[in-house]
Amino acid sequence: MTDSQALVPGPSPPHSKAEICYGATFFNISSYGIMEKYETPTVIFGYALPLLELQIILIFVCIVLSHMFLRRIGIPRFVSNILAGLILGPQLLDLLEYSSDRLSLDIPGNVALEGVARLGLVMFTFLMGVKTNKRAVYQIGKRPIVIAVSSFFVTMISGLAFRNFRLDKVDPLYMPLRLAPTERSVIVSIQAVTLLPVITHLVYELKMSNSELGRIAISTAAVSDFLGFLTLVCISYVGTYRYVSPGIANRDIVALIILVLVILFIFKPMAQRIVDMTPEGKPVPKVYLYVTILTAIAASIYLSVFNQMYILGALLVGLAIPDGPPLGSALEARFESLVTNIFFPISIAVMAMKADVVRALYSFDDISFNILLLGLTVVVKWTASFVPCLIFCELPTRESVIIATIMNYKGFVDLCFFDVALRRRNLSRATYTVMIIYVLLNAGILPTIIKALYDPKRKYIGYVKRDIMHLKTNSDLKILTCLHKPDNISGAISLLELLSSPLNNDNKDRGVIAVTALHLVKLAGRTFPILIPHDKRSKARLLQNSYIQTMMLAFTEFQQENWESTTVSSFTAYSHENLMDQDICNLALDHLTSMIIVPSGRKWSPDGEYESDDIMIRRVNESLLDLAPCSVGILNYRGYNKGKKKTNSIINVGVIFIGGKDDREALSLAKWMGQNSRVCLTVIRFLSGQELDKSKNWDYLVDDEVLNDLKATYSLANNFNYMEKVVNGGPAVATTVRLVAEDHDLMIVGRDHEDYSLDLTGLAQWMELPELGVIGDLLASKDLRARVSVLVVQQQQQHG
């Protein structure tokens, strides 16, 4: 019996002589029960399965007890997982050492628990890859690249500059002098990189996944992770080439390239094929789910065989899964609860168990510079992330602080890197302990700071201009049109026909109209909301829903008639009423739309008479006006195209211009329509009878500039008219609006005119539809005799 075994109470574990001789880890799996040996019932823990069960029970007891207290102060469960591992570590219960002695003569006696822990990491990393917003990963703009490059390289260079500082003070008993720079390089490298699965987990935990801020964070993490991946591969290749064998180094890098190619050109198309073959609204066959999970596990095993970071395989497979239903959502629904609540906590606790606080305190003098280096890299990385956000990306200060804080967040993949470095002896046990405690504090403090700074009501705020007024020359006009009922289809298409101009497609100063049609269906009989894309491949598997078929046929016909100037993509969203505005905003963010067009909710009969108001649609519109990441247009349609042929009828479009950003946006939209030969555009500017000093008001100056530009553009056009009307007081405004409406088929007006000289307060008190603004409410009134449709425009709400 060894010294370590002599310290363990109870009988010796049931090893054979051969096992003792070779120090092997072969052991019996299941026992005969607790009564196998009545005098010493603990003998059952000499078997793998009962011991594993005891280990898991102890882990969850510690997690639950820790979280009972920590959750009261808002600390995430991830911290409780680490804390449970520290409680069960050498400084207190020393579970791993005890378990090792029960099964074998060396540490690998915990192979069963280690296996469960690694499986948990693989599964959780895979799910994070599945849940990652693929558009944020694959459609990366300049801002995330700048932030990621700055934070990665500035941190890496600054940290490595101090790598050899005070090496002469390192105690050879703590670590050989030649290994000390390697340990510091590990610290700097892991600090420099921001890992995509970790940030995905954080963004989902903070419920930021649908916000633009969350998308910036994920895109930035994707770039940083890619840079870290390349760095890791290069370092691994050079190290293996120099210190092991050139042949093995070449073999490992070729194996990695083969896996990436297989995932890109075989697995990813197969996953897309599964999605295409699954009928819309139907679940994916279970066999595909299990095959997908096994593929992720196999990819991880494959990489571990070739000396690569094993969880990378699971991440690559997860990123290859198409977003949302049916496959991605099914994987989340089936495996997320098991992995998140069972496997993942075990994985974190097992890695934390290897930390030895007592040893770290004993070696404090030797690791003190490592602690200083860790603090330095934290400050440098935060600064290197904050400055580009604020200066180059022009994000508001609060959002810049949030992004910089997110970039410093550390999580489960970082723990995995530390664990691998410890096993490869690139980290000492004392430094490993410091890094575990650092992640513990990091994961407890940073999310709390982010929660305090992040306002969920601002989740869809656009940090770049997404409106029609600021579109660049030759840019496509991206419009998201929303439909709640079949009655909304004709109005939406009639409006879009005015924006497209197939007869004047030789205009080189404008792009095409990129239309995204979203059919919103109130959720009934479904547990989870679902977004279904429609494309050519989905025609054979359409939902048996006549409304959706009608929508698709109508928009398909519209695209065929305007194929030179228009593209159309269609979606159906099954959603709860209170989440419809979020579905609209999410799709608008994904497609970078300039304007969302929604129906007003007021229904008119075929002969133009008022029928009813839909309260649900009005509530959705009110929320959308507050949340939208781009401009919004609310269409009150009364059938201006009735009795008119599409090819030769003239549509009289009027714009009432009072002033302000909403009116300027309405004018920009009308300018697009003016290029259609079927449109006769009239701009009516309302002026106050009072004399004003316009030179002191910036908005007045901008209004004049926009109007002058419009008049110059259409100075020679036969289909453009401009007039000015002087109105004094609310009654005069109402009368003039009603008279103007009689001469037009469609009126386009801005929503907000609060800062302007026209006295509209009296009219505001009598509004029936506040979401349309004062002028829009007048034009949508039940009492208005003129059969005119109205589009009320609100420009993108930007916040500094």
Swiss-Prot record:
GO function terms (MF aspect): antiporter activity
Taxonomic superkingdom: Eukaryota
UniProt cross-references to Pfam families, sorted A to Z: CHX17_2nd, CHX17_C, Na_H_Exchanger
Keyword field: Antiport, Ion transport, Membrane, Potassium, Potassium transport, Transmembrane, Transmembrane helix, Transport
Biological processes per GO annotation: potassium ion transport; proton transmembrane transport
Membrane-topology descriptor: Multi-pass membrane protein
GO cellular component terms given for this protein: membrane
Transmembrane stretches, start-end: 43-63, 73-93, 110-130, 145-165, 186-206, 216-236, 247-267, 287-306, 338-358, 371-391, 401-421, 430-450
Subcellular localization(s) per the UniProt record: Membrane
Similarity comment: family membership: Belongs to the monovalent cation:proton antiporter 2 (CPA2) transporter (TC 2.A.37) family. CHX (TC 2.A.37.4) subfamily.
Cited function: May operate as a cation/H(+) antiporter.
Name of the protein in its database record: Cation/H(+) antiporter 9
Organism (species): Arabidopsis thaliana
Gene name in the database record: CHX9
